[in-house]
Amino acid sequence: MKDLLKFLKAQTKTEEFDAIKIALASPDMIRSWSFGEVKKPETINYRTFKPERDGLFCARIFGPVKDYECLCGKYKRLKHRGVICEKCGVEVTQTKVRRERMGHIELASPTAHIWFLKSLPSRIGLLLDMPLRDIERVLYFESYVVIEGGMTNLERQQILTEEQYLDALEEFGDEFDAKMGAEAIQALLKSMDLEQECEQLREELNETNSETKRKKLTKRIKLLEAFVQSGNKPEWMILTVLPVLPPDLRPLVPLDGGRFATSDLNDLYRRVINRNNRLKRLLDLAAPDIIVRNEKRMLQEAVDALLDNGRRGRAITGSNKRPLKSLADMIKGKQGRFRQNLLGKRVDYSGRSVITVGPYLRLHQCGLPKKMALELFKPFIYGKLELRGLATTIKAAKKMVEREEAVVWDILDEVIREHPVLLNRAPTLHRLGIQAFEPVLIEGKAIQLHPLVCAAYNADFDGDQMAVHVPLTLEAQLEARALMMSTNNILSPANGEPIIVPSQDVVLGLYYMTRDCVNAKGEGMVLTGPKEAERLYRSGLASLHARVKVRITEYEKDANGELVAKTSLKDTTVGRAILWMIVPKGLPYTIVNQALGKKAISKMLNTCYRILGLKPTVIFADQIMYTGFAYAARSGASVGIDDMVIPEKKHEIISEAEAEVAEIQEQFQSGLVTAGERYNKVIDIWAAANDRVSKAMMDNLQTETVINRDGQEEKQVSFNSIYMMADSGARGSAAQIRQLAGMRGLMAKPDGSIIETPITANFREGLNVLQYFISTHGARKGLADTALKTANSGYLTRRLVDVAQDLVVTEDDCGTHEGIMMTPVIEGGDVKEPLRDRVLGRVTAEDVLKPGTADILVPRNTLLHEQWCDLLEENSVDAVKVRSVVSCDTDFGVCAHCYGRDLARGHIINKGEAIGVIAAQSIGEPGTQLTMRTFHIGGAASRAAAESSIQVKNKGSIKLSNVKSVVNSSGKLVITSRNTELKLIDEFGRTKESYKVPYGAVLAKGDGEQVAGGETVANWDPHTMPVITEVSGFVRFTDMIDGQTITRQTDELTGLSSLVVLDSAERTAGGKDLRPALKIVDAQGNDVLIPGTDMPAQYFLPGKAIVQLEDGVQISSGDTLARIPQESGGTKDITGGLPRVADLFEARRPKEPAILAEISGIVSFGKETKGKRRLVITPVDGSDPYEEMIPKWRQLNVFEGERVERGDVISDGPEAPHDILRLRGVHAVTRYIVNEVQDVYRLQGVKINDKHIEVIVRQMLRKATIVNAGSSDFLEGEQVEYSRVKIANRELEANGKVGATYSRDLLGITKASLATESFISAASFQETTRVLTEAAVAGKRDELRGLKENVIVGRLIPAGTGYAYHQDRMRRRAAGEAPAAPQVTAEDASASLAELLNAGLGGSDNE
């Protein structure tokens, strides 16, 4: 019994470990793993099905085929355990050792490991400092390499061809040593003295100045140091012993009909063994050199194919022309070991079925079909049956359940009570895609789902399926109940707003019951309370919409949080009074005393949650749903063709538009406008007409005229069903109604350009053939887009999760005073996002002062909740500095104060929360949503008429920033700068509106002038970009040669002619290098200088520019010299948006980025070269000037002599985030990325909290490049984890030494994921081979800090409920205790023993 216990203990023991190290395996190490050498290529005997001895499946090496039974059958049963049979040499033990015992093959000639050879950069090549081509020629026996030059003139590592080798032999005899093949490379690697080489390289590094050389040297130094420190020996990159995978991991399965299905690895191993044995035989026979050489090359190729098939040369294919799967393919890719088996596994105890509506369920319930429940809860039922004594054995219990006896259903009811199940809908895009519910048993076969959780699951009932999982252990049930229950997930983690929001029918019902109607039955009554209102409605004495007075009792919370009653008479309607009956105490009556649309209902739930907390909100949400469904049914709202009222004005509007189009067409034919301008204008006309039709239609639908009690006519909001559905937010939008009853509008072609003839018909009138045909474009594009975008969005989410997965809240407060300034987002005349929305739930980084005083309004380190935000609004604060994860000082994680509020829970975030994953999901989930939604409007082009003026909305004074302007002949200002901003300032000095003013705009009011609301302050032509002269004089053409750089277009009708500049592609060879330009000269023909500079005024013209002046014309400043047609706008939707988000997170450089000033100083222009100008910035303090060559075609925003600050825009274009980081710092780049990403999502109406984007930015900024190493042991130019540098510098400064200086790096999310400290995480993401090769050479240790690594090694993750376990392990390790081994009690032992004996007796159950 005692040794049996020991045996059991050995099985249950789990290894405790803190880190995983990867390294190269030495030949001795491979031999130590092995249980014997595989000598023959045979697998199994096809007649007896027994494995061949010494073959690939040999039982003597790898273990017995059957449990506790040797191959020849001499020893069977458990009692002979551990005996080695003297006849067949097999150890009697369990079969599962065939999954863990390895073998080996002794290679007759060394072979190079292809990963270290071909995985770029080639490690062997880098170590030997030889080109890969040369090494390959040596390895594959094409040339010789000199290993020892001796006294000859041959260098070590010199490559010799066959002839050169023979010549050298004749000349020097055996003075020198040269070889070919892997043994040569092995000899070279063996003879390297790494430490000496390292010293030598460091000396070289200090002497050299060339950038490329330095890079190469540092690379080599890093590799050599890695070898020295990790204890790897270079020659181990050449294999002399090949390990053989355990046979059960490369199985051979007999199919019916005597054929076998086998793993590709067996074929690959067979080739290696065959070639190896042949080579041994040839060597024994002392065969001619050329034959041996050929065999060695073939062996090298066979080993290559086994390790990584297809990496070099053509992939080896099997019988069916498909490349064989090598060892490398087994671990990489979606089907590889990491992603298929380690990161996600299939689970037991799960089922799936179609979902249907469960409108009578409570929020925490789901309907589970009895059949499913019976199957899922089987183990619990068996246990209960035995416990009750209703069944004697498990087998008997099994029988009872199979017969479905009556008692089984009773037991099932008991088992299921209070036992939550998890429901999951694929794709699980965010954590709300898996929630826990209590099951309610139902008949039928479909799962019933509560309608309010559909939004979180993004589920609908058109055939969606969901999976059910059963949490088995007590801990799992507890977590499901406490954390995952649907009632605990009312707020969305992405934006902190309720996600349990009624939609569709419920909204329509509530909207219908809270609408009021003129002269409804029972109008003017005074009622004693909601109860009476309901009685009157039920008995038919009053209409739901009747305007009445009702006595209402409200409850308000006082200072102590006690509820105080307050009764008053309210003007309201019957329906609202009835709805008041379900509103929980503590909410004001105003909340229901309005027509409730979807937004109002959401706000109502939000208020309820903030004031009353979780439980009342859940009950309220359920009540809202029941009520909504009931009254939606009563409303009888339905859609009939007569509900689509076509406005009378439609015909008139369309004929006006057609007239305008005809006029433009005429102008085009008479040459007044170009084709491009005509197209743009036509589209604008139709876009405007469309807006007018839809406005007329909405006005028409919106109101109806009724007779009131006094017999007068009165307008009231319409009860048209379609209008009610759209107005309440239940279904449909103005854009969709426009297509039903207005006009379908402009359509887009598949390439995104807009077709200029719109569809003037609507769906009610019906489309003709042409219109229908045009419509198919958009509809088809929508569907095609959807398929593509879903994949792209999923991939974006995967990259985001990967980069942020190890970010967890690890401490309460890091104590930093850093933070980012938050200001409201103002676009045009609207505040797109007020300050309160941006700072809500953040922590202040410094005291917020009352504007204009020194009084502290909000102290530092305050979590800004709703009440604080109200205070900020009352005092009109317009900038607050808040803590941010980007500036958090915690190493390996962030602190709770820098993160702020946990959006899904409404209080400050807890330690151990995996904020990285939440952030990634919050950004990734809407990406997919939006892309799936593109086709709902059916591809109708949604393009606003182009902006052509600025009209302010409020009164105030104008403030212009970064402006340059000239006064034109009529005394107006013309803007000549490119990023001018016009702000409207109110009397308190707050910015109310902000606009971008384009180049060439004419201003009606100047800087500092007062304007009235509704006044137009600037206008411009939206379709062409002018070239404006800043000086007066005469025009002189340069390089404008007809037929070479320009063509003259004369209009037949008007005889007006204009010059069009040719694109360089269209020019003749002679015109390629010419630069057409307009020069301004004075009457004497001398150059006129641009004011304030000593540059002549000449304006280079880009291709397609149109000039309507003649040579020598007189002009005055502010006049237009030429017009450049702008490309017409395409349609805007997230199709452009998703790639934009991906570009931002990948930190890609835009094609032609803006050029920013590298230093502050005065601008001047140096000597020009052919196509470039030389820009020189001279600092004011007299240090070295900075020079940069800029292509001439770039339009510059600066003039000679102008003063620029570091980071100012010199030439327009999209800004590259790397430049912003380098020149303006971390906060600027954070602001840039956050705002740009938010712009894309805001366009789609998706709310995401800024925090989430900041979390990702923090991860993108986690590397730093060492500029100067100081006393640290970093290398200059080395890229290191930012936290590492911080820690090292802290230690150095504590010892009074000089820290390293560094610059922060911005990495794209893919790069950042691959550059993590953890090689396991990186390998399971992408480029598995490269990551593992690099890690093995460097002998990396993975500290298992992140979530992914811990999932892969099969542990609890260091976040959430697993956080405590990890903290505990760290504490124990620090205290130096050994972690307690699992205790085995006698009961456990006997139970395990019984199980083993059963297995032994059954013998057949060994699956």
From Swiss-Prot:
Annotated Zn(2+) 1 binding sites: 70, 72, 85, 88
Modified sites of kind N6-acetyllysine: 972
Binding, Mg(2+): 460, 462, 464
EC number: 2.7.7.6
UniProt cofactor(s): Mg(2+); Zn(2+)
GO annotation (BP), single: DNA-templated transcription
Any one GO MF annotation of this record: DNA binding
Disulfide bonds: none
Complexes and interactors: The RNAP catalytic core consists of 2 alpha, 1 beta, 1 beta' and 1 omega subunit. When a sigma factor is associated with the core the holoenzyme is formed, which can initiate transcription.
The protein's name: DNA-directed RNA polymerase subunit beta'
